[in-house]
Amino acid sequence: MTDLKASEGDLSDYYMRLKKIFSNETRLQSREASISKRSSRVHKNILSAKEAIERQERDFGKLQKVLLNRNQELERRFTLGEALAQQLEVTRQRNADMEAQLLRHTTEGRQRSNELMECMHSLKQATGTYINHEAFPARLNGVSVVRADDGDIKLIPFSLDGNDADGLHTLWRSLHTRTDNASKWRKLISDQEVAGASPVTPSGSERPKATSKHSNFMPTSIIEIDLTSPTNDAS
């Protein structure tokens, strides 16, 4: 009887052990399933993260390429800007030089014009001859004031071809040999000699030709009185 009870106790204990083992195994399987699910999710997340990283790397490569192109474009524009700035500075300097040169030429031209106007005024006073400078250089037009022996004043108009050397010399001799303006002529020539000029006055007996060396003296000077500025002295 005692042995039977002992045997029943052993079976009960054995049953409890088996039950505990099955329970532990079930619990382990449940844990394994849970771990497997978690592992699957982690693995899936890792794959997603890897794909996202690859996409970002591709996007970064594209952005890096765009950035490189932009940097190259900026360098080209910067180089172009420097070249344009240098060219602009050269142009400004050239314009400044041209303005200075133009101002100098304008000043010299104005001074020369004033000198010519003074010369023309002196010639008018010395010769009593008034020239229309607007007809130069094609023609020599004007009027000469001549005092006759009886004291009367006559106005003698003239119109000569600018290339007519004989006519210009004839006009020169006519003006130069006028007795009423001889003192003015002497004063004008004296002033020119003092200033370093070398005027040539052909004599009344000379008959200069168109090819004569005298053809470049006073007639040429008359034509060169220019005749770019208006005459301030009315005839």
UniProtKB/Swiss-Prot annotation:
What residue ranges carry the coiled-coil annotation?
44-106
Q: Which GO terms describe its cellular component?
A: Ndc80 complex; nucleus
Chain spans, region Disordered? 193-216
Keyword list, A-Z: Cell cycle, Cell division, Centromere, Chromosome, Coiled coil, Kinetochore, Meiosis, Mitosis, Nucleus
The answer on whether this UniProt entry bears the keyword Cell division reads: yes
Q: Which family is this protein grouped under?
A: Belongs to the SPC25 family.
Q: How does it assemble?
A: Component of the Ndc80 complex, which is composed of Ndc80, Nuf2 and Spc25.
User: What is the name attached to this protein's record?
Assistant: Kinetochore protein Spc25
| Organism for this UniProt entry | Drosophila pseudoobscura pseudoobscura
